[in-house]
Design a protein with these regions (language model features):
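A short, aliphatic-rich alpha-helical micro-motif
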Residues: 4-5, 20-23, 102, 153-157, ...
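Glycine-rich Rossmann-fold phosphate-binding loop(s) that bind the pyrophosphate
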Residues: 112-113
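N-terminal Rossmann-fold NAD(P) dinucleotide-binding loop
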Residues: 116-117
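Phosphate-binding beta-alpha-beta segment of Rossmann-like dinucleotide-binding domains, i.e.
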Residues: 48-106
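Rossmann-like adenosine-cofactor binding region
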Residues: 136-193
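An N-terminal-biased, well-structured beta-alpha scaffold segment characteristic
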Residues: 1-52
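Conserved beta-strand positions in the Rossmann-like core of class I SAM-dependent methyltransferases
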Residues: 131
C-alpha cells in the first residue's frame, strides 16, 4: 500500500497514520461508513489538506429500518421468546422483559441528521412520542420535540428508548457517559448505531 500512495489522489476506506506521510498527492478520502469508527480521525489526518467524505444520506432508510427492527423486537420481548424456542420451551406467559405498547411509548433520538430523521418518522408511524437532540438541526422533522445537548440526561431519564444515531467523532466522544446511563429508567432500552 505504501508504494502506491505517492501517486494516489483518492482513497476509498482509511489511511493509517503510518501510511499518511506517503500520501503526498492525496486529495480525497472516502469513508465507507456514514459515521466513521473510533480511530478513523487522528491528528495528522485532521491537519492534512485531504477532503474527507462519507456516504451521508445513502443509508438513511436502511439504517432507520434496522433500528426499528430492534425497537419492535425489544418492545415485544422477542429475545426471550427466541431463547425459550432455542431450548424447546413453550412459554405461555409473557417474557420476563417488559412489554412496550409503542403507541404509548417514547423515544429520544440523539443525532437527528438523515438517519435520525428517518428513524423519527418511523417511530412516529407507530404512534411513539419522539424527542430529538442535535447540534445543527439541518432537517425539518414534523412531530419531533426538539431539545439541546444540555438536556440529554433529563430527557433520557423520561423515555422508553434512547437511540443514538450521532456519528462517532472527537466531538461526540463521551456524550453517553455514566451520568446518562444512570439517569435512564431501569426498563429503558438504549440502541447505538
Amino acid at each position: 500500500v505504501k508504494a502506491e500512495l505517492p501517486d494516489t489522489d483518492a482513497v476509498f476506506g482509511w489511511v493509517s497514520p503510518d501510511c499518511l506521510p506517503f500520501a503526498k498527492r492525496l486529495r480525497w478520502l472516502q469513508s465507507p461508513q456514514a459515521g466513521p469508527t473510533r480511530g478513523f480521525y487522528y491528528d495528522e489526518l485532521v491537519a492534512h489538506p485531504v477532503v474527507v467524505c462519507n456516504p451521508r444520506g445513502v443509508y438513511n432508510d436502511h439504517i432507520a429500518q434496522h433500528i426499528m427492527m430492534y425497537v419492535l423486537a425489544l418492545s415485544r420481548g422477542l429475545p426471550a421468546y427466541l431463547e425459550a424456542q432455542r431450548h424447546s420451551r413453550w412459554e405461555r406467559d409473557a417474557p420476563s422483559t417488559r412489554y412496550v405498547d409503542l403507541s404509548q411509548a417514547s423515544a429520544l433520538i440523539v443525532g437527528v441528521g438523515g438517519i435520525g430523521q428517518e428513524t423519527s418518522l418511523r417511530c412516529q408511524a407507530f404512534g411513539m412520542t419522539v424527542h430529538g437532540i442535535d447540534e445543527r438541526w439541518e432537517y425539518e422533522t414534523p412531530g419531533l420535540q426538539r431539545h439541546n445537548a444540555g438536556e440529554l440526561r433529563g430527557v433520557a431519564a423520561e423515555v422508553d428508548f434512547v437511540i443514538a444515531t450521532v456519528p462517532q467523532t472527537p466531538a461526540t466522544e463521551g456524550l453517553f457517559n455514566r451520568d446518562v446511563f444512570t439517569a435512564m429508567r431501569s426498563d429503558a432500552v438504549s440502541y447505538t448505531h
